[in-house]
Structure formats: structure tokens, C-alpha cells
A protein has these predicted regions:
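N-terminal signal-anchor transmembrane segment
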Residues: 1-45, 60-69, 361-363, 377-381
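Helix-loop-helix junctions and helix-breaking kinks within/between transmembrane helices
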Residues: 18-30, 65, 72-81, 165-170, ...
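Transmembrane alpha-helices of multi-pass inner-membrane enzymes
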Residues: 34-39, 217, 221, 354-364, ...
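Aromatic-anchored transmembrane helix interface
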Residues: 54-60, 72-95, 105-110, 114
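Alpha-helical transmembrane segments of multi-pass inner-membrane proteins
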Residues: 107-141, 154-208, 213-226, 332
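A membrane-periplasm/extracellular boundary helix in multi-pass inner-membrane enzymes
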Residues: 119-128, 207, 227-269, 282-286
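Hydrophobic transmembrane alpha-helices and their immediate junctions
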Residues: 189-193, 217, 221, 225-228, ...
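TM-adjacent membrane-interface loops and short helices in multi-pass inner/ER membrane proteins
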Residues: 259, 266-303, 308-311, 315-322
Length: 419
């Protein structure tokens, strides 16, 4: 139980308080990362599976690119901060789920943070004084919150609602959390699941992340299709929730265009359009085949907004190919689990909910920057959950086959066949 509590604290720190300083450049996340790494080794040995090995190959090429472009110190700072934390989250997730049967524990911690994030986003949008205490507790700058509220118009026009994690990260996080909210061990989605889903989905809508909203809708449909006893009834309820959301959007979302970034218009496309950003990243890579994301940033460029370019900016030509191999391998595993669940219904509810939530993160990475190569914590956590739950299912299946074989041999020895 101590390890599970430590994991919960560590995950919350990684998501919300990762910049909280302790002394000098050392943050609370740095200290807890080392503690959890040592603890993981004592609990289950040093976990260094095939995924982590290939990711280390990617990091090797990423380091070379950073050294060549003169940003070695920045890379090693990212290595000891972001990447090491992602590694430890991956390993500790596997330990919690495998050794302590903590799949629901991990899911619960994520949902607690998701609810706090959702309530904060809703409070930000409405400027409700009730949200003040929560915002202060979670270290959100209240002066900026109030100033932004008074500057905004009555609709969504120009309004930034980032929750606790920021606009894009909240889009990722809430889309996966919407799927996790539908998990029920009894294989029947309850009223509480729907209420939790509705709150998270509403907050996701307020955040205005289009890819996150689409991923949440698709993920919810997929999870319901492969898991519920009465799929038609559950889908009817889900459609009802979406209809209510559409009514709200139609009534209050007339000014949804975020004009400051022009995310919903073609005006200013040359400067901030996603295709233009991706092309700038691609051209930079062609001029610097060894990569170097920090050099790209130093030149005044914004991130390319797609993992297919980011892999080459972070890892160069060779590291990018390695990262693409990892991502396509992950996508293949996700789709295979979904296919098997549709055809045979032989995977656990827990595996399916982690799998679909991870699928949402993969979809988001196609249109944004947080991904495997950036060391996104939730990407590593959800994939760690998928891997360990699949390993446990295979081990259980092999154990059952061995038991059946032994039973068959015992029966044959007791009742020899007489010709």
C-alpha cells in the first residue's frame, strides 16, 4: 500500500507540480523520480523491457543531434528531468498494476486529477468565485485569471480555458480521462460513470481542443462497443449526451473562434497554420539531418504540431526512424487489441480502457506536440498499463493451458486407454 500511495503522490507531482523548486535547479519532481526509481528496483528489479530499450536508442541519436547543434546541456537537462520521469512513471505503473493489482488505483488517481482539472477549467470559463480556493490551492495565478475574465467577452471569443495543465495538455488529458470515466468493473456503465463523463466532456469542450474532442468521442464509442453488455442502450445514452452538448454549443458557442491564435479560421494561415508549422519543421530537418529540436526553437520557430515531424526534429534521421518504428508498433498493438476485443471479447475491461485511452493520446499526437518523443508522462503511463495488463493476460492464459495439460495427463494415467 505504501508504494501505491507514493506512486499517487509522484504522479500528481509530475502532472501538476513538476516545476516546484526545492533548492537551486532541483525540483520536487527530480527528488521523487530518484526515490521512485530506487523503490521500483527494490520492488520488482530494474524493468528494462523491449520498449524502453528501443526508446534509449532514440535518446542516443537525440543526444547526438543536440551535441552537434550546441545544445547538449539543454538535452541532458531534459533527460534528467522529463525523460527520466517518464521512464519511472512507466516502470512504477507496471509495478503497481502487476505486483499490487493496482489497475483501478492508477485509474482513480488519473481521474481525481482530471476532475480537478475539469472543475478548474469550468471555474476559469465562468469566473465563478467558488473556484478561487481551488485555483489558489493548485497554484494557478489568480491575478491573471481575473484579468482574463474581465477582458473576455460573454461568449467563447478569444477566451483561453486551460484548466490546470494548459490548453493543449488539457485537451490530451481530458480526452483520455473521458474514456477512463466509463470504466466499470461490473461491465455496465452506471449513472455515476455518465455523470463523471459529462463533467469531463463539458470541460473538454470549454478547453476548445478540437483533436481532443474528436478523440474523446471516438474513444467513448470504441470502448462502449467492445465492453458493454447492452451496447445499443449504452450508445443511445452516449448519443443523448452528445446531443445535449450540441444544443449547448449551438446556444452558447457562436463565438467559438479563438481569434488570437486563429485556430478556427484561415486568416493568418501563413504564420500560425498547422501545415505551415509542419513544413517549417520539415525544412529545418532537411537542413539538419542530425536533428536538434532546441536549435529549431532557438531560431524562433514554433513546434510543428505533428509527431511525424517531431520525431525527426528530436531524434534526427536515425532517431526519427527508430521513434516512428516504436509509434507504429504501439499503434499496431492498440489496433490488434481492439480487433481481438471486437471479434472474441477475450480481453479484460481494464486492458480495454487503458488501450482506448492510450489510442486517444496517439490520435492527439498526430495534431499536437506532446508525444512519446517529448517524454509526455501520460503517454508512458497508459502504454505501461497496456503492456503490463497484456503480459498478465498472456501469463494467465499460459498458466491455464499448463493446468489443463497436467489435468489431462493425470486423467490418462488413472484411466489408461485399453485397445
Amino acid at each position: 500500500m505504501k508504494f501505491k500511495i507514493a506512486f499517487a503522490i509522484y504522479l500528481i507531482v509530475c502532472l501538476l507540480y513538476y516545476t516546484l523548486p526545492v533548492f537551486g535547479p532541483v525540483s520536487l519532481r527530480h527528488i521523487l523520480t530518484l526515490i521512485m526509481l530506487v523503490w521500483c528496483i527494490f520492488e520488482q528489479g530494474f524493468i528494462f523491457d523491449k520498449f524502453l530499450k528501443w526508446f534509449c536508442v532514440f535518446l542516443f541519436f537525440s543526444a547526438i543531434g543536440s551535441i552537434v547543434t550546441g545544445y547538449a546541456s539543454v538535452f541532458f537537462s531534459r533527460l534528467l528531468g522529463t525523460y527520466l520521469a517518464a521512464f519511472v512513471i512507466y516502470m512504477s505503473t507496471k509495478v503497481v498494476i502487476k505486483k499490487y493489482n493496482g489497475g483501478r488505483w492508477v485509474l482513480s488517481v488519473v481521474l481525481i486529477v482530471a476532475v480537478l482539472n475539469a472543475l478548474t477549467a469550468i471555474g476559469q470559463f465562468y469566473g465563478n468565485p467558488i473556484a478561487t480556493f481551488l485555483l489558489q490551492l493548485l497554484r494557478v495565478d489568480m491575478s491573471e485569471e481575473m484579468m482574463e475574465f474581465y477582458e473576455n467577452t460573454e461568449d467563447f471569443h478569444g477566451r483561453y480555458v486551460g484548466g490546470l495543465l494548459g490548453i493543449v495538455t488539457s485537451g490530451y488529458f481530458l480526452s483520455g480521462a473521458c474514456v477512463l470515466a466509463l470504466y466499470n468493473a461490473k461491465k455496465k456503465i452506471s449513472v455515476y460513470n455518465w455523470l463523471l463523463f459529462a463533467v469531463l466532456f463539458f470541460a473538454l469542450f470549454l478547453v476548445q481542443e478540437r483533436s481532443g474532442l474528436g478523440a474523446a468521442i471516438l474513444g467513448a464509442f470504441l470502448y462502449i462497443m467492445v465492453n458493454t453488455v447492452n451496447s445499443k442502450n449504452a450508445i443511445f445514452r452516449l448519443v443523448f449526451v452528445f446531443v445535449i452538448a450540441i444544443v449547448v454549443i449551438s446556444r452558447y458557442g457562436g463565438g467559438l473562434v479563438d481569434w488570437r491564435e486563429m485556430r478556427y479560421s484561415t486568416v493568418g494561415f501563413e504564420d500560425v497554420g498547422r501545415a505551415n508549422l509542419s513544413m517549417k519543421g520539415w525544412h529545418y530537418f532537411l537542413d539538419n539531418l542530425m536533428g536538434g529540436i532546441d536549435g529549431f526553437h532557438a531560431a524562433g520557430n514554433r513546434d510543428p504540431h505533428t509527431v511525424f515531424v517531431n520525431v525527426f526534429l528530436y531524434g534526427g534521421m536515425f532517431g526519427g526512424l527508430v521513434a516512428l518504428g516504436i509509434i507504429f508498433s504501439q499503434l499496431r498493438k492498440v489496433l490488434q487489441i481492439l480487433y481481438e476485443s471486437f471479434r472474441k471479447k477475450n480481453h479484460s475491461l481494464m486492458l480495454n480502457v487503458y488501450n482506448v485511452a492510450f489510442f486517444c493520446y496517439i490520435l492527439n499526437s498526430f495534431f499536437h506536440n506532446a508525444s512519446l518523443v517529448s517524454g509526455d508522462v501520460m503517454t508512458f503511463l497508459l502504454f505501461g498499463g497496456v503492456n503490463v495488463l497484456l503480459e498478465m493476460e498472456k501469463a494467465e492464459s499460459c498458466s491455464q493451458i499448463e493446468i489443463d495439460d497436467n489435468l489431462s495427463n493425470n486423467i490418462n494415467s488413472i484411466n489408461p486407454i485399453v485397445e
